[in-house]
Amino acid sequence: MSKKRGLSVEEKRTRMMEIFFETKDVFQLKDLEKIAPKEKGITSMSVKEILQSLVDDGMVDSERIGTSNYFWAFPSKALHARKRKLETLEAQFTEVKQKKESLQQCVDKAKVGRQDTEERSKLVEELASLRHRKEELCADLEKYKECDPDVVEEIRQSNKVAKDAVNRWTDNIFAVKSWAKKKFGFEERQIDKNFGIPEDFDYID
């Protein structure tokens, strides 16, 4: 018999938010350490860490009154956090797109007189697809004028799709860099320097 898989960090965060949304109540840490394992399957030892991560991300509010800390969260709070996350993803998207376009210009110059339109066409299609997804995310945001507990799952899914889209662009940039190095002898350090690609440029976790 296979061993039951434990909850991921994201699943724990989602279930913790469900406690707040379903009860619309204010809790102390000790209360959540009792409720979370029983109702949501979150181990009591991980409650504090998960709760703090939600506070750090602006999903849960916290206030110290006397000697005790109190925690609460409402759907409208999640909506604002989602807006900030979307803005962050859009900024990352714009930055990646600009770097991609700069690299594409470099490759286009190097390909003068060469027939290599298939790869270029694929990159153009990917750009159109990602632009369309960005428009969908913005339109989806408008639908959440009134939130309900389902917003937690919606936030997780939308952010995952947007993050995957940005990471696909990161894949494209790495692919173009690799292609340029192999075909034209460009050095990676030179490409990064010429087009302002930071040393820590990488995928979004």
Swiss-Prot record:
The keyword rRNA-binding does not apply. The gene is mnd1. Disulfide bonds: none annotated. The keyword Iron does not apply. This is Meiotic nuclear division protein 1 homolog. Residues 79-147 form a coiled coil. PANTHER family: MEIOTIC NUCLEAR DIVISION PROTEIN 1 HOMOLOG (PTHR31398:SF0). InterPro entries: LZ3wCH (IPR040661), Mnd1 (IPR005647), Mnd1_HTH (IPR040453). One of its GO terms (molecular function) is double-stranded DNA binding. GO terms for biological process: reciprocal meiotic recombination. Required for proper homologous chromosome pairing and efficient cross-over and intragenic recombination during meiosis. Stimulates both dmc1- and rad51-mediated homologous strand assimilation, which is required for the resolution of meiotic double-strand breaks. One of its GO terms (cellular component) is nucleus. It comes from Xenopus laevis. Keywords: Coiled coil, DNA recombination, Meiosis, Nucleus.
